[in-house]
């Protein structure tokens, strides 16, 4: 895929940061020495970690040069580096591996999450938050529109572009981590974000889930796809009593602590 667009991503920064803050609030650590923000994006979550743990060494990692540039501009005193969560191995064991809205992009969670948990120092915590919205209208309509227009061949299999089959049920994450953990906390929350109109909902997903559908398209097909998708979204998210739209957005949270 093309590189991420930090400006588009941060257009809804308050809404995107809320689950990051709620994940961090459930981390059962007092004074970690080394905290890794895995998939740090533009640094909004890294700033939360640094504020809560001011004495910790906090390092942000991401695969996107554009996101890392934005994070460094936001937090010039912190360290950021290019790294892939699928293969990353730390030089020394972290006390906190914090992965907010990143692991949903990666396959094989049955291997990935236990691997990350195993990298922790004794007493360390793996904290994960992942969107769980592939069954929501935003994502069902991505796949439907992708399969039905002149852009279908360029996009390919909508199930692949839509990352179907990667997310597990919340209880499965518990089962993966509980045998090796001192404590595992798993929960699922559905946020309902107030959006101005259908175009705002499209802008939200253009920064994230819509990228694998749009990136392969030439400008003409991209415009046509967005027009068809926006019309579909307009029908799926009708105006509420104040004229706004409500975007339902489920997320899964996992916090696992290693024995000391």
UniProtKB/Swiss-Prot annotation:
Q: Please verify whether the record's keywords include S-adenosyl-L-methionine.
A: yes
Name of the protein in question: Trans-aconitate 2-methyltransferase
**Family the UniProt entry places it in:** Belongs to the methyltransferase superfamily. Tam family.
Which residues, if any, are the signal sequence? none
Give the subcellular location.
Answer: Cytoplasm
Cellular component terms, GO, for this chain's entry? cytoplasm
User: Which domain of life, per UniProt?
Assistant: Bacteria
Q: Which UniProt keywords apply?
A: Cytoplasm, Methyltransferase, S-adenosyl-L-methionine, Transferase
Q: Matching InterPro entries, A to Z?
A: Methyltransf_12, SAM-dependent_MTases_sf, Trans-aconitate_MeTrfase, Trans_acon_MeTrfase_C
SUPFAM superfamilies per UniProt = S-adenosyl-L-methionine-dependent methyltransferases (SSF53335)
Reaction catalysed by this enzyme: trans-aconitate + S-adenosyl-L-methionine = (E)-3-(methoxycarbonyl)pent-2-enedioate + S-adenosyl-L-homocysteine
- Give, as one word, the top-level EC class: transferase
- Stated role: Catalyzes the S-adenosylmethionine monomethyl esterification of trans-aconitate.
Q: What is its EC number?
A: 2.1.1.144
Entries under Pfam families matching the protein: Methyltransf_12
Molecular-function annotations in GO: trans-aconitate 2-methyltransferase activity
